[in-house]
């Protein structure tokens, strides 16, 4: 029997699937975009983010697939994903679960093995990253022929919403320190909303050794080392509505250790 989250997801997904497809968008018909969505306890958020993704891609006539990598969520996220896969079809929604929580970096490694697009988009499944920015990412990539396009909270009209002052100070402080120590050539080193050429992401994954949230930081640092080009698009980051943040004391300690390791080795 489907979970309540799956039922809500089915209704939203059916509405999105019924939306008409307007004229051709800005991306080439030959291009395909694979979205990697790592999930852990995202039953409430998953139907909404998938609905928004489908809406954004459909309105822009962009060829896409959404790959859900669930790490053994105990809240029924996998069952919701199975329902979404049935609604949209396995050519659009690909559930590629793992049996337990193995970390963000390895989730991307697992997901890219199943990606058939020539571009890969990584983003959070908790609604912190709105899919409405994806067409802007694609336009930016085409205009500058960039290898990577990264969403930034710290440039132009970018910003963070829903965080208290303490968390904003910690985020700004962490980003400032990374800019001083690593000089990454990007304004938002810890962000996780990005578009990559598939072959570039594969190469970076081979080079990166970090785990968890530090993985995102190392990806940009290694990209600079390999002379990959990076474009940026200002985004609005909104704190999650459903569920709890996975950023805790252990993640902060890991971040500091990872920062020092990257400083010493790059």
From Swiss-Prot:
Keywords: Acetylation, Endoplasmic reticulum, Glycosyltransferase, Magnesium, Manganese, Metal-binding, Phosphoprotein, Transferase. It is found in: Endoplasmic reticulum. Its EC number is 2.4.1.83. GO terms for biological process: dolichol phosphate mannose biosynthetic process; dolichol-linked oligosaccharide biosynthetic process; GPI anchor biosynthetic process; protein O-linked mannosylation. The modification Phosphoserine is found at residue 3. It catalyses: a di-trans,poly-cis-dolichyl phosphate + GDP-alpha-D-mannose = a di-trans,poly-cis-dolichyl beta-D-mannosyl phosphate + GDP. Pfam families: Glycos_transf_2. Residues 1-19 have a biased composition (Low complexity). One of its GO terms (molecular function) is dolichyl-phosphate beta-D-mannosyltransferase activity. GO terms for cellular component: endoplasmic reticulum membrane. Mn(2+) binds at residue 126. Residues 1-31 are annotated as: Disordered. Pathway: Protein modification; protein glycosylation. Component of the dolichol-phosphate mannose (DPM) synthase complex composed of DPM1, DPM2 and DPM3; within the complex, directly interacts with DPM3. This interaction may stabilize DPM1. PANTHER family: DOLICHOL-PHOSPHATE MANNOSYLTRANSFERASE SUBUNIT 1. Transfers mannose from GDP-mannose to dolichol monophosphate to form dolichol phosphate mannose (Dol-P-Man) which is the mannosyl donor in pathways leading to N-glycosylation, glycosyl phosphatidylinositol membrane anchoring, and O-mannosylation of proteins; catalytic subunit of the dolichol-phosphate mannose (DPM) synthase complex. This is Dolichol-phosphate mannosyltransferase subunit 1. It comes from Cricetulus griseus.
